[in-house]
Amino acid sequence: MENLSERFNVLQDQLMNIYEAAEQTLEAQIAHWLLLRKEAVLLYFARQKGITRIGYQPVPPLAVSEAKAKQAIGIMLQLQSLQKSEFADEPWTLVDTSIETYKNAPENHFKKGATPVEVIYDKQPDNANVYTMWKHIYYTDADDKWHKTTSGVNQTGIYYMQGSFRHYYVVFADDARRYSATGEWEVKINKDTVFAPVTSSTPPGSPPGQADTDTAAKTPTTSADSTSRQQRSPAKQPQQTETKGRRYGRRPSSRTRPQKEQRRSRSRHRTRSRSRSLSRVRAVGSTTVSRSRSSSLTKAVRPRSRSRSRGRATATSRRRAGRGSPRRRRSTSRSPSTNTFKRSQRGGGRRGRGRGSRGRRERSSSTSPTPTKRSRGESSRLRGVSPSEVGRSVQSVSAKHTGRLGRLLDEAIDPPVILVRGEANTLKCFRNRARVRYRGLFKYFSTTWSWVAGDSTERLGRSRMLILFTSAGQRKDFDETVKYPKGVDTSYGNLDSL
């Protein structure tokens, strides 16, 4: 215990010396993260031994110490790699190499020169959000070579240049869905308006199948599902009220009637799915029998029922029952199923009412068009991407506020590519010829590259090259027009970002 306390105190003294010196060298930052790693390892070891306090310092749980040690190792490896680049002699502060700056958007990049960007929604100064734009961003390419690039802002969002490609790490349309009611925003830097109010009812690259969801998401306190339910319910209520007025012609006899109606409505929703499956199974073997039972039961029982919330299937059965003659209704009211229904009504229990309503609903579900209409309406909001939309987007896909399904739909419209495999010189000659002969049939050509083994730097297989297109149609025209060299094979693909 004393040995651990002494080592911990030595680490604390060394950290304090680094903080007081505040050196702006990369060597000092590497030493700082090395001490943080040793501190996390020491606290992890102490917790394993059951020690909960070292001096005045409480020992955190094992998971916390393990996470901090892994963070320190990751940052230290990145700094050691940066030390071998041409940017090692630049001034580096504790803020520039902190984990908070490293994990800030864009994530896992070293950044310098923070500049606040204010975005005002709906022309209301109180409804604003502040983002960070970085003057310099450092990133590595596929060959682990460090590059230094600049960052910029436009009406779409904040980006940094990766070669000739704009990589957006902040998209204003994502937060406009939450904070804006009209879909307008204004971009300001240092209190100067850079871009006038921009209107975006649907964010760029959003598939048409999500139009309803995006529109509903503009209201902050209302979800898409609740909005769709509120829009569908007013259309059903007048029909139910009108039917009840024609059918019964009187008001509820007590104050507890609305509560009973709510309980019956909830029971109807709980038993709807089970009644559908049972009715489908029965309809396979005895379609005629189920229809005759539904007709006789509907005509005999519905005049005596006092249920107030039954939906469109019940209203349809009532109208059909109303067309029958009184004589026929009297003759069919003596059926055994009617007596069963009366016994369930006299029971008065919530459970009995649920079974009675479910039985009636099972027999009349074969003539009800409601499930088909409802499923059709729900599936229209989550339909897939049409073939004409595939390959339309050429921007990075946003992962915010869309969910897994929304991201899959967004990625379905990513720009298509063709992967070409062959000898390096053959691919280079093919690229040079295609630039001259087939201009306009493609967007970009990549340089030749190869896969590398995980435990060495040895190149695996033949060289590869990517060809980018703006749409699937352009890729099809290119593939049908171009004659590939001998020994070269191709395959299709899509990328979520360039």
Swiss-Prot record:
<keyword id="KW-0244">Early protein</keyword>
<dbReference type="GO" id="GO:0003700">
    <property type="term" value="F:DNA-binding transcription factor activity"/>
</dbReference>
<keyword id="KW-0804">Transcription</keyword>
<feature type="compositionally biased region" description="Basic residues">
    <location>
        <begin position="301"/>
        <end position="332"/>
    </location>
</feature>
<dbReference type="InterPro" id="IPR036050">
    <property type="entry name" value="Regulatory_protein_E2_N"/>
</dbReference>
<protein>
    <recommendedName>
        <fullName>Regulatory protein E2</fullName>
    </recommendedName>
</protein>
<comment type="similarity">
    <text>Belongs to the papillomaviridae E2 protein family.</text>
</comment>
<dbReference type="GO" id="GO:0039693">
    <property type="term" value="P:viral DNA genome replication"/>
</dbReference>
<keyword id="KW-0235">DNA replication</keyword>
<dbReference type="GO" id="GO:0006275">
    <property type="term" value="P:regulation of DNA replication"/>
</dbReference>
<feature type="compositionally biased region" description="Low complexity">
    <location>
        <begin position="280"/>
        <end position="298"/>
    </location>
</feature>
<keyword id="KW-0597">Phosphoprotein</keyword>
<dbReference type="Pfam" id="PF00508">
    <property type="entry name" value="PPV_E2_N"/>
</dbReference>
<dbReference type="InterPro" id="IPR000427">
    <property type="entry name" value="Papillomavirus_E2_C"/>
</dbReference>
<keyword id="KW-1048">Host nucleus</keyword>
<feature type="region of interest" description="DNA-binding domain">
    <location>
        <begin position="414"/>
        <end position="498"/>
    </location>
</feature>
<feature type="compositionally biased region" description="Basic residues">
    <location>
        <begin position="265"/>
        <end position="279"/>
    </location>
</feature>
<keyword id="KW-0678">Repressor</keyword>
<dbReference type="InterPro" id="IPR001866">
    <property type="entry name" value="PPV_E2_N"/>
</dbReference>
<comment type="subunit">
    <text>Binds DNA as homodimer. Interacts with protein E1; this interaction greatly increases E1 DNA-binding activity. Interacts with protein L1; this interaction enhances E2-dependent replication and transcription activation. Interacts with protein L2; this interaction inhibits E2 transcriptional activity but not DNA replication function E2. Interacts with protein E7; this interaction inhibits E7 oncogenic activity. Interacts with host TAF1; this interaction modulates E2-dependent transcriptional regulation. Interacts with host BRD4; this interaction mediates E2 transcriptional activation function.</text>
</comment>
<dbReference type="InterPro" id="IPR042504">
    <property type="entry name" value="Regulatory_protein_E2_N_2"/>
</dbReference>
<dbReference type="InterPro" id="IPR035975">
    <property type="entry name" value="E2/EBNA1_C_sf"/>
</dbReference>
<dbReference type="InterPro" id="IPR012677">
    <property type="entry name" value="Nucleotide-bd_a/b_plait_sf"/>
</dbReference>
<dbReference type="GO" id="GO:0000166">
    <property type="term" value="F:nucleotide binding"/>
</dbReference>
<feature type="compositionally biased region" description="Low complexity">
    <location>
        <begin position="199"/>
        <end position="228"/>
    </location>
</feature>
<keyword id="KW-0238">DNA-binding</keyword>
<keyword id="KW-0805">Transcription regulation</keyword>
<dbReference type="Pfam" id="PF00511">
    <property type="entry name" value="PPV_E2_C"/>
</dbReference>
<keyword id="KW-0010">Activator</keyword>
<feature type="region of interest" description="Disordered">
    <location>
        <begin position="196"/>
        <end position="399"/>
    </location>
</feature>
<dbReference type="InterPro" id="IPR042503">
    <property type="entry name" value="Regulatory_protein_E2_N_1"/>
</dbReference>
<feature type="region of interest" description="Transactivation domain">
    <location>
        <begin position="1"/>
        <end position="201"/>
    </location>
</feature>
<comment type="function">
    <text>Plays a role in the initiation of viral DNA replication. A dimer of E2 interacts with a dimer of E1 in order to improve specificity of E1 DNA binding activity. Once the complex recognizes and binds DNA at specific sites, the E2 dimer is removed from DNA. E2 also regulates viral transcription through binding to the E2RE response element (5'-ACCNNNNNNGGT-3') present in multiple copies in the regulatory regions of the viral genome. Activates or represses transcription depending on E2RE's position with regards to proximal promoter elements including the TATA-box.</text>
</comment>
<dbReference type="GO" id="GO:0006260">
    <property type="term" value="P:DNA replication"/>
</dbReference>
<feature type="compositionally biased region" description="Basic residues">
    <location>
        <begin position="343"/>
        <end position="361"/>
    </location>
</feature>
<dbReference type="GO" id="GO:0042025">
    <property type="term" value="C:host cell nucleus"/>
</dbReference>
<dbReference type="GO" id="GO:0006351">
    <property type="term" value="P:DNA-templated transcription"/>
</dbReference>
<dbReference type="GO" id="GO:0003677">
    <property type="term" value="F:DNA binding"/>
</dbReference>
<dbReference type="InterPro" id="IPR033668">
    <property type="entry name" value="Reg_prot_E2"/>
</dbReference>
<feature type="compositionally biased region" description="Polar residues">
    <location>
        <begin position="229"/>
        <end position="242"/>
    </location>
</feature>
